[in-house]
Amino acid sequence: MAVANFLNEAKSQGNKLFLQFGGQGSPWLKELSKLYESEPSLKEFFETAFKTLAEEIPSLDKKIVSQGYDFESWLKSPDSAPDESYLSSASVSIVGIFLTQTANYVSLTNKGFATSELLANALGATGHSQGIVPAVLVSLGKEGAEFYKEFSKFLKFILYLGYRAQELYGVFNPSEEVLKGNEEIGDKQPAPMVAVIGYSAAELSERVQKTNTDLGLSGTKAIYVSLFNTPDSNIVSGDPEALLAFRKKFKAEMDEKKVKFVYLRTTAPFHCPIMDGTENTVPKDMERIGFQYKGSDLKIPVYSIFDGRNFQNEPDVSLPLFREVLIKALHWDKATANFVNTPKVVGIDFGPSVVSQKLTQANLGSSENKIYSASSPKDIKVLLA
């Protein structure tokens, strides 16, 4: 297979690559359906995915995944898929997003971006929230049958991250009081996570802490700044009742300062201590499926979304990976610092959609580095030119 012109140009100009993967909150079914329909080279990828999911479905509680994980039927006939509220639920979307971004990666490796070439020229990799999981998968450097063996394990792992998170939190069903309270102040579709756009991280943290103190909230009842995305766009996680109280407390100020308050399409509060209880379930799942990796298994640096450290230096990668997706706060500036601060680096984002690409662009500042998205038709033309 010929090496893509984009890669050859990067090498000739002395540019390194940075690989990144998106996180929750992105629509995925349309993008994944298009890959399923239009990419014959992904036949083995989808067959492996469907077989892997079928192995786990019988042991799952129907209360958590009431309409199952019938991705094969949904992709063959998108019109027959469940409604958006089910597809965006934490236990389902985490799987759909992982499949979409990994399919984008595999598709690109079949078009002149062979794994060996990508990794040989990579500065490193990371992923926004759950995107750190495929970043580790890719960094193993596996190809062919060896890749699909690992892919199957990673798919089971991410399935259980979403499933156990929802199991712990319970099926999301906001009370009439919460629905009415949000409606009265003009907010829609309450959720356990909300984007607050317009406060600095320090300003938001101060207001979150004041809310917890004034209302006597602590532990699983408190609210937390859970994802520090850009200088003025961050996420707060917590019970919808507490998030509503936070919103009411500062709504006048938010309106005055034009601060946006937008609920995410998800059904569990990730990246905060409310998920501490998954320590009792996920490690057992990991042991059962054989999900165990060391830092020395990684062929390129994978940067932590909590503190930016290189996972290659970790004796164990598996447990930190679980904790970074479910429990620990995300600091996107730390995860992408090496990309932002190293000259002559080109980023490739594997989606889904362009959300994580835009988050990274917002942190580039004066850097001249560029990042292209495999989910963007315009950017794909550049990558495959």
Task: Describe the predicted segments one by one.
Residues 1-5, 130, 165:
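Long, contiguous juxta-domain segments that are non-catalytic but functionally important
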Residues 24-27, 129, 133, 240, ...:
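Gly/Ser/Thr-rich beta-alpha loop segments that engage phosphate groups in nucleotides
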Residues 101, 123-131, 135:
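Gly/Ala-rich beta-loop-alpha elbow adjacent to hydrolase catalytic centers
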Residues 126-127, 235-236, 349:
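Conserved SAM-binding loop
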Residues 138-324:
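Alpha/beta catalytic cores of group-transfer enzymes, especially the acyltransferase/condensing modules
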